[in-house]
């Protein structure tokens, strides 16, 4: 496999785009590679400018549950496009989509549509602080909630502490109200409650940005109880897991009803769309009814809403969709683990519905510290081998993979066979 055109394209992009990419992970820096420049996608496959094709386990980082260029979704987008791209005014489609979202999630009365997961979490936190009338926020090490300043925070000295900025350009003042606790650790979390005047807690119930690390059920139930005890708003960030892990996101697995929730990715079917929502008494604090300001020129734009609505209609019609996707994810993760065992390579694998992850690690991964113990050098070697064998995996050991509806058992088995070849070559030093 050659990537000559992609190499040239990447060099050219670096001249006019900061870093050559519009989101850092796309640069393939952590796997020491060159990103293939994509020409098109269809179904489960990606096609690059060098005429290579790949089984795509990234699926645009999660939104494409029906794969690339789904004919029904594509047709509906084109029909909507003919009527206009954006109006800056209400449409019936927005209400229809909101009804579909609300109907799938317990405790969700109202939503507000936005353009990105970052906007959704940022707005949800502002709303939660207004409702609780308390400023401090608890987040968890390893969870990602977008790139707003108050959330680009890492733990300081100790696992339960007021955080420090994790990015240049973020003033300390932005992080002084953010406490960072250890994921899956209730003791660490309650320490944070005792240290600050906590108004809200935000968490990925199925974390997808330290690799795939699901919350333990007793932890999430305990977190809900702590929020009730300390009168804090619980925000579940389901931007990635919502409509992905199941029709009801994490609720299928945990049964936890949050005060607020954020969705994204699947609800936009590959176009920029996200939302936040929750109980009516909280949501009604939003302008124009209440005093919490939030707005967006392109929020609820008809193309994204049409795409998302088309995807949700397809999901709801297909009663066995999640069962099939889960079975394929299990087939893949079990196949990868068995292959690694044949070469005495430590590999931990897991899936939650159509989300899957794997760590080159001898032990189960329950939090960010565990994830950091994984062999990232081995991951980089494995990723490069798989890429050149036509299998497109997330280009970081701290990302999550995704199954899409067009995938078949034959595709999964082929990917496992390529993994076996890759492990063999790595062990032999080829």
From Swiss-Prot:
Q: What is its EC number?
A: 5.4.3.8
Carrying N6-(pyridoxal phosphate)lysine, the residues are 265
Q: In which pathway does it act?
A: Porphyrin-containing compound metabolism; protoporphyrin-IX biosynthesis; 5-aminolevulinate from L-glutamyl-tRNA(Glu): step 2/2
Compartments it resides in:
Cytoplasm
Q: Which residues form the signal peptide?
A: none
The gene behind this protein is hemL
The entry's protein name is Glutamate-1-semialdehyde 2,1-aminomutase
Q: Source organism's superkingdom? A: Bacteria
For this protein, the record's HAMAP family field holds: HemL_aminotrans_3
Q: Which residues form a coiled coil?
A: none
Q: How does it assemble?
A: Homodimer.
GO MF terms held by the record: glutamate-1-semialdehyde 2,1-aminomutase activity; pyridoxal phosphate binding; transaminase activity
Q: Name one GO biological process term.
A: protoporphyrinogen IX biosynthetic process
